[in-house]
Amino acid sequence: MTQDQLKQAVAQAAVDFILPKLDEKSVVGVGTGSTANFFIDALAQHKTAFDGAVASSEATAQRLKGHGIPVYELNSVSELEFYVDGADESDAHLNLIKGGGAALTREKIVAAVAKTFICIADASKLVPVLGAFPLPVEVIPMARSHVARQLVKLGGDPVYREGVVTDNGNVILDVYNLQITNPVELEAQINAIVGVVTNGLFAARPADLLLLGTPEGVKSLKAE
């Protein structure tokens, strides 16, 4: 199976998982990226089964609207039963690295509101230790150099992601060469740097369920 076929399979599995639990008042949180796009396309086949969605990026909002799915502001929604999103890496505890698509801050906010965070990914994303994928950090533009110096002190090698401005008007530093053995601690350390909006570690609020696309089929993993 191709990577896209694996992504399609996990996207459909996520729809199959949440659909029996949705009703006409349900609002679904939706992530950003190629795997999330497959989820949106699969979810759109059942758009009469729920009320609408909260999007984690402008790109996701446009795709949802293109399918005729109502998109709500998070501030207007009292609760989200589910948040479904992809990941760049996951460990066995379902700590994640996200933010390859630069939507990490809004993704983290929507995930924090959701009762159940479902991560959908192909098998290549499951790793023993996080950090081979560079860790994205969203930064207030004027603090970029300061934050980069602090990230070097933490053992990372930050690289400015040229030409990228987040939906919030900020910039991204991608931090290479981190061996992330304690993701909860590192997430807090980086977020404590003045000028950091947030970083792409989802460890304080990890995923609750990982649907992993493999050549043998979709596997469901809960945190070890």
Curated annotation (Swiss-Prot):
Substrate binds at residues 32-35, 85-88, 98-101, 125. The active site is at residue 107. GO terms for cellular component: cytosol. It is an enzyme of class 5 (isomerase). Its EC number is 5.3.1.6. GO terms for biological process: D-ribose metabolic process; pentose-phosphate shunt, non-oxidative branch. Keywords: Isomerase. InterPro entries: NagB/RpiA_transferase-like, Ribose5P_isomerase_typA_subgr, Ribose5P_isomerase_type_A. Signal peptide: none annotated. GO terms for molecular function: ribose-5-phosphate isomerase activity. It holds the Pfam family Rib_5-P_isom_A. It catalyses: aldehydo-D-ribose 5-phosphate = D-ribulose 5-phosphate. Pathway: Carbohydrate degradation; pentose phosphate pathway; D-ribose 5-phosphate from D-ribulose 5-phosphate (non-oxidative stage): step 1/1. Catalyzes the reversible conversion of ribose-5-phosphate to ribulose 5-phosphate. Homodimer. Belongs to the ribose 5-phosphate isomerase family. This is Ribose-5-phosphate isomerase A. It comes from Pseudomonas putida (strain W619).
